[in-house]
Amino acid sequence: MKFIIKLFPEITIKSQSVRLRFIKILTTNIRNVLKNLEDDTLAVVRHWDHIEIRTKDDNLGPQICDALTRVPGIHHILEVEDRSYTDMHNIFEQTLEAYRETLIGKTFCVRVKRRGKHEFSSGDVERYVGGGLNQHIESAKVKLTHPQVTVHLEIDQDKLTLIKARHEGLGGFPIGTQEDVLSLISGGFDSGVSSYMLMRRGCRVHYCFFNLGGSAHEIGVKQVAHYLWNRFGSSHRVRFVAIDFEPVVGEILEKVEDGQMGVVLKRMMVRAASQVAERYGVQALVTGEALGQVSSQTLTNLRLIDNASDTLILRPLISHDKEHIINLAREIGTEDFAKTMPEYCGVISKSPTVKAVKAKIEEEESHFDFSILDRVVNEAKNVDIREIAAQSREQVVEVETVAELADTDVLLDIRAPDEQDEKPLKLDGIEVRTLPFYKLSTQFADLDQSKSYLLYCDRGVMSRLQALYLREQGYTNVKVYRP
């Protein structure tokens, strides 16, 4: 099985040296992502205008394709089959064999890319093959604009490449081609989408979380960060830094006037994140702020927030409306996380100012004990995001993990609905119920609490995190099922 990876167009217009660097980085990223497949026959080979992937294990095709569609820097992926040919009629015969079943009852067109010296042009092949397919396939019709099926062929000297399928890629730049950034992540719609947008633009995104809601809040945000990394950025190691910001909030509530609290809190977050960024050599902060979305996000207030630090602050969503942000969250898979994530920042100020005055803000901050800010930053927890799974095991030692179920146990499948549909969980004599992880916080209480529930997910990470969360909420009838 062979895949041809086409580069994002912005890569192809770079200078020769920059383009080569981008291609090398993309090739390395692909190898890092695919190494989890443990396929000894897998080969990744870079070329000037594309990257080839070959494997002798055809069963891995769907997994390879799925992984590639989530690697930044790829425009599209072609699933291809290389053949030799003798003449133009032979090209038609091979195309007919490959596409006969696909084109029955469909409109189609033929598109050919050709390299090398031949007695025919690309247009000649398109007309000859298209006409032949039209004559030999029942109810198939040629339609050059917006056909139902496009038959893609590539001819390189004496080699014919049949393109069996085309899959759209993520686009953007390969991660690592730009410098590192630190995303201020809250787990909501905005911070998840803004993190994704910087990953797609080639940045390795680290995460900084300001904990205002206890360990349950931290667990939820870790889930979002781990999901984003695992889905779009697993080619690189990244940090997850958690800062206990409750002492800072307490100091603000005690020392700062109500109307100024929102802006002061954001300035404190920027100061703390800037210290973290400087510690790890990160060049910029990323936030999910959008102009005018909340009181602290007016131009006047954003300028004052920026002035709290010399560190560059990137706001990829600055001109996006909320509906567009939610749509993007839905596309990348973070919507369900965000729906159930509590928003703590908005509750500390009852009458927030929309046009803060610098002198007033500085006066309010003069009452603040900055040693508290320094202390929480120094005590920040820094973990490799890959260790979140191991950390969850340590945190839930009080939650029993079992490999066998009793007849009275209820197996609770907490995987996402699409995963449940793809691999339904069935065990003889055991009651199996489905409740996606993002609904546990709101719907677990509705279940029969006289029963014992064993939480299940594919790798055991989400089930452990959710078991810890439910334990903290006072539920003692939960365990983790790991067969």
UniProtKB/Swiss-Prot annotation:
Binding site for ATP: L184, I185, K266, G288, Q297
Native source organism of the sequence: Yersinia enterocolitica serotype O:8 / biotype 1B (strain NCTC 13174 / 8081)
GO cellular component: cytosol
Pfam family name, one: ThiI
The name this protein goes by in its record: tRNA sulfurtransferase
Enzyme class: transferase
Biological role stated in the UniProt entry: Catalyzes the ATP-dependent transfer of a sulfur to tRNA to produce 4-thiouridine in position 8 of tRNAs, which functions as a near-UV photosensor. Also catalyzes the transfer of sulfur to the sulfur carrier protein ThiS, forming ThiS-thiocarboxylate. This is a step in the synthesis of thiazole, in the thiamine biosynthesis pathway. The sulfur is donated as persulfide by IscS.
Record carries keyword tRNA-binding: yes
Subcellular localization: Cytoplasm
